[in-house]
């Protein structure tokens, strides 16, 4: 898809869809005040490589179905957070252990991550 990311558009869409449940679980943990210490950049790279290997042949239909389902479930989960939960902070290992809020996790991981890949998909498709 790009010079640095060789995954197909379909695989990227499936990847984004697959990450929503994980990102929501992290936001829920932070919202409950629990430190998230087991997520490292090495673990992210390993997860991404495993996903690419296991789902290299995903079809457009299955990738879009997963995206629709998981994004709807993620949206419902985000809407269920209270203001207090969104404001709660706890240490997060991807931020070098700095305390971050659940809102930050939602905005920086679920939303920014999707937006980042959408930009790459658009470039690949010439849009």
Segments from the language model and where they lie:
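Acidic/histidine-rich alpha-helical segments that form the ligand environment
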Residues: 47-88
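Short, contiguous alpha-helical
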Residues: 1-46, 89-127
